[in-house]
């Protein structure tokens, strides 16, 4: 997110987006969600949820700690009604099972359903996928397949469809974003 001083110096044009990631481990270093200059942001992505290797569904690495942070972020959103809160899945250290979760239609459906359930249960506004990286690269131990590129697109499609269905049920417009490599 940068330091509060850096954030205070920035201005954003009407209609623009200012997205920040809040890393769950930042609280261990004394930077808690209530210190985020939310008035300067339109969206906060909570980093990171992971993919459970056994069920290939969304999971929190440290549920008690993460739940506390998510509660603090929801409180911050109450004080900043313009703010969207998303769960970010993956990142450098937790992308190893994306390829497995995206490999088949059944797995994509299950993973997407778990994300939608998580968003609804946690009172969030959407999901950010941070798969580092489809096909090749990323941290040691990350699983890759040649079909990752196509499967990632299909995973995004499945997740978007399930989020839209949920949105029609509860009258909300859920966001789906990705963190992608450039170049």
Q: Could you describe each region identified by the protein language model?
A:
Residues 2-9:
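Boundary at the C-terminal end of the N-terminal hydrophobic targeting segment
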Residues 10-119, 135-136, 143-158:
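Glycan-recognition patch characteristic of GH18 chitinases/ENGases
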Residues 44, 127-129:
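Hydrophobic residues within beta-strands of alpha/beta enzymes
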Residues 83-85, 127, 172-176:
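Residue-level recognition of the N-termini of beta-strands and the immediately preceding loop/turn
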Residues 90, 132-134, 179-183:
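An acidic- and aromatic-residue-enriched active-site/binding cleft used to recognize and process polar
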Residues 149-183:
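Aromatic-lined carbohydrate-recognition surfaces of secreted/lumenal glycan-active proteins
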